[in-house]
């Protein structure tokens, strides 16, 4: 299944600003994006970003072994977001830099641990993880709690300037 994620330009700009704010002890910021999901062909899904919620400062946990560690309160708040709106839930953070970013080993391991839990709130939607750079993105989507993640095919910034990025072969 190939998936495209469309994000309104103003929202994407706001996500970038939020993820680059300093935190008292975390090395990076984390947020959650919700998205509606539409079938866009026999083997293609379209995710339309709806909302972005930053993780509150008090929901970060000190851990010098990772860029950011968030607690169960952050996960609970995110689950409440999607439960009410029947949306896909996407955990999002930034690695900065230019070009298509890649997930770290920690990103991949932790995503494989926590993303299946999102299916308890909204079982019939895909859920996943995204990592941004300054001009691109990479995403993994899970289509069920017992499946592995599939890479997002591409991303589209909607609005002026319209831009496609993060394409995967």
What are the functions of these language-model segments?
Residues 1-88, 96-169:
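Conserved beta-strand-loop surface patch within small alpha/beta domains used
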